[in-house]
A protein has these predicted regions:
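A shared catalytic/ligand-binding motif for oxyanion handling
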Residues: 1-157
């Protein structure tokens, strides 16, 4: 977990790889998360049938992941921005594709996301995901700046 701030806005980023223990892992970190948390994970599982090139029924693991994400008030940011897109993050040697890498965020924080996209990678069987935020650069007036008092400039005759 990385905690910090971007343009004076708190953010926490959690990276997870836990295909066998999805529910337990999310439950364990629930106390560490808040509305500023972004979870980046490879669960080796899709969340919706649309996330696979081969249309299969939703299995129990998929349903458990979907239920757990809902219980934590999280949202699949990529699916929220691209509800009908058939883009994939993983390609198998069998010629099938799936979106098994996810970026989850709190539902109330969705307005802070500018865009998200899947970027092709030629060096891996997983594509990269890019997330841009709406953090605006804040102009802060430096209170330590010295200023000349203009009354000293009056000429006395």
């Amino acid at each position: 977990m990385i905690k910090g701030s971007i343009q004076e806005e708190d953010i926490a980023i959690i990276s997870i790889y836990a295909p066998q223990y999805i529910r337990q892992t999310l439950t364990d970190i629930k106390g560490e998360t808040d509305s500023s948390t972004i979870i980046v994970e490879d669960f080796n599982i899709t969340i919706t049938p649309m996330d696979r090139s081969s249309k299969q029924k939703i299995n129990k693991k998929t349903q458990v992941l979907d239920d757990t994400v809902d219980e934590m008030d999280l949202i699949d940011i990529c699916r929220a921005f691209h509800p009908n897109a058939e883009e994939y993050t993983f390609s198998s040697a069998h010629g099938t594709f799936s979106r098994i890498d996810h970026i989850l965020g709190h539902k109330s924080n969705l307005s802070k996301i500018k865009k998200i996209k899947i970027v092709s990678s030629i060096f891996s069987d997983h594509n990269t995901m890019r997330l841009d935020t709406n953090c605006k650069k804040k102009t802060v007036r430096n209170t330590n700046t010295w200023r000349l008092n203009n009354t000293f400039l009056k000429q006395v005759y």
